[in-house]
Amino acid sequence: MKDFAIIYDLDQTILPAAAVPEETFLPIYEAIRSANQGTVPDEELEEALKKIRTVSMDVIAKEHNFSDAMKEAAKEAFLNRDYKFSCSPFDDWPVVKRIPGKRFLVTSGIPKLQQAKFDALFEEGDFDGIYVDNIYDENRLGKKRLFEKIAEEQGLIPDLIWIVGDNPDSEITAGNELGMKTVQIVRPGIEQSDKASYLICSFYELNDLVTKWEASLKFKA
């Protein structure tokens, strides 16, 4: 049988957003508040800051019309510091290691911050490849291009690649546009979408889904 791959998102898929200590983000909050200068109403700004744990900074800035000064303050605050903390994944993370197929991780964000999460969560060999979609990279590829890159490097057609994540407007949309199988994992607080090919609430369900699909391929072969 041919190889196949599963590409996982990180935040709100493997790692609860609340698992990263709040103090990690305090300097970022303060930098953005200081640069605001009345551009965004205080109440709206506080709502925007609450999203930093779960939503990419570039998306937040666009949605709430951050000024250039606010964007630059956020960028400097994110980039000019080191990160180290302890955090724990969702309880069903160990199930991922039992699910058939090659495993890849693709996550958007700040490389140093995402690396701190990797260091706290993963062991060597947990994934066949890890990719960070760096939101501040001038030559940013984006998740869609990274998915294509993995497919090309692994010699896999889209139908043999699964995309698993929580965000229907990010990894799910990218996977759909490439003709890959998409699975939205609906963690607590995540709104269910009709964009994905499949809906699950845990990796136990993903294991059942992929195992049955793999068995059907073997049967056809």
Language-model segment annotations:
Residues L45-L49, A61, D92-K102, L121, ...:
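Alpha-helix C-terminal capping segments
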Residues R33-S34, E46-R81:
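A metal-dependent, Asp-based hydrolase signature
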Residues M1-D42:
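Active-site neighborhood of HAD-like aspartate-dependent phosphohydrolases
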Residues N80-L105, K144:
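Short, acidic loop-to-helix structural element flanking the phosphoryl-transfer center
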Residues M1-F4, F104, I110-A221:
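Asp-based, Mg2+/Mn2+-dependent phosphohydrolase catalytic module
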